[in-house]
């Protein structure tokens, strides 16, 4: 599919969404279906939270963060959102999560599928994503919608759910999105910077004035670990008690937030800061001038954010 054809399709799709229409693709067929206003049970793909999920997945693909089946996204669904699409559910068998998240018992999540490509989410969502329900113990899940051609949720499901549990408890339920992407500039930096929270936070804060305002608590760093298992999930969830961003060395980045816009914006900001640092290091190994610890304190005062002093060390 050519870039021009792809652009035309996306423009048509979003125009249709704004007009209250739905555009769906099934094999070679494309059709529009108008939904009657005030219909009690919306079709699943028309739900606003599903549209937001699809858009965020496509935004990440367009940034170049999701080669092949790389990366994953999950959203903790609000009770009223789950209720609005319940008529579309077809519950499957219960399966073990691979960890236990008791605080999330009974919750619903929208997640990307294992082995699925982000580039296909916008054109084949029913095959690329799924909604899952957790049992009351938080030990098992079942698919209630999606992955129509078979499959299972992302292989990083234990990491996602353990981090959802941590952020839900830490924020009184405000945080609902967990996002993992293969951000190239952040990954590159994990080969040349010490793998410490202090160094990564300070270096990325210095690259753009907005950074301490967007991620004032800093960034956590997980050393290289085998992905997809409980060990990396535990290590990441420990960092998420303190941070909204965790870098996985030589792998990518994990971000958490209240909604799709804030979480994508957080990932985008950190990766852009990393891009600036990579460019700077390609020009010379040191800086002639930068933002000082006192500058950060002044910024924190005026923008009313709290910046941990552990990142204000003298170089």
Label every model-predicted segment.
Residues 1-12:
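Single conserved hydrophobic/aromatic residue that forms the stacking wall/gate
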Residues 9, 17-18, 112:
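N-terminal non-cleavable signal-anchor helices
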Residues 10, 21-22, 55:
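Alpha-helical interaction segments
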Residues 13-19, 35:
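Acidic, Ala/Val/Gly-enriched low-complexity intrinsically disordered segments
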Residues 18-21, 25, 123:
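Polybasic, lysine-enriched low-complexity intrinsically disordered terminal tails
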Residues 23-41:
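Short, Lys/Arg-enriched N-terminal segments with co-localized hydrophobic residues
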Residues 42-315:
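Glycine-rich flexible loops
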């Amino acid at each position: 599919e050519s870039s021009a054809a792809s652009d035309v399709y996306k423009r048509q799709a979003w125009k249709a969404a704004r007009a209250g229409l739905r555009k769906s693709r099934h094999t070679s067929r494309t059709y529009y279906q108008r939904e009657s206003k005030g219909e009690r049970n919306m079709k699943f793909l028309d739900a606003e939270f599903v549209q937001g999920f699809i858009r965020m997945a496509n935004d990440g693909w367009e940034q170049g963060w999701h080669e092949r089946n790389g990366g994953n996204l999950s959203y903790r669904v609000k009770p009223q959102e789950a209720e609005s699409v319940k008529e579309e559910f077809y519950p499957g068998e219960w399966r073990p999560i691979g960890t236990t998240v008791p605080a999330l018992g009974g919750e619903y999540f929208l997640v990307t599928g294992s082995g699925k490509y982000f580039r296909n989410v916008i054109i084949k969502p029913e095959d690329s994503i799924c909604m899952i329900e957790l049992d009351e113990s938080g030990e098992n899940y079942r698919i209630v919608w999606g992955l129509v051609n078979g499959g299972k949720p992302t292989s990083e499901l234990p990491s996602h759910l353990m981090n959802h549990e941590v952020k839900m408890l830490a924020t009184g339920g405000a945080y609902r999105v967990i996002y993992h992407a293969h951000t190239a500039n952040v990954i590159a930096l994990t080969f040349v910077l010490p793998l410490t929270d202090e160094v990564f936070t300070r270096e990325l804060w210095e690259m753009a004035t907005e950074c301490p305002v967007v991620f004032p608590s800093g960034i956590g760093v997980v050393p290289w670990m085998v992905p997809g298992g409980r060990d990396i999930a535990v290590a990441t969830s420990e960092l998420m008690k303190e941070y909204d961003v965790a870098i996985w060395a030589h792998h990518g980045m994990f971000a958490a937030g209240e909604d799709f816009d804030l979480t994508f914006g957080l990932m985008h900001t950190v990766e852009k800061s990393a891009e600036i640092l990579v460019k700077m290091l390609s020009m010379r190994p040191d800086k002639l001038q930068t933002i000082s610890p006192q500058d950060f304190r002044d910024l924190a005062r005026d923008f009313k954010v709290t910046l941990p002093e552990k990142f204000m060390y003298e170089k």
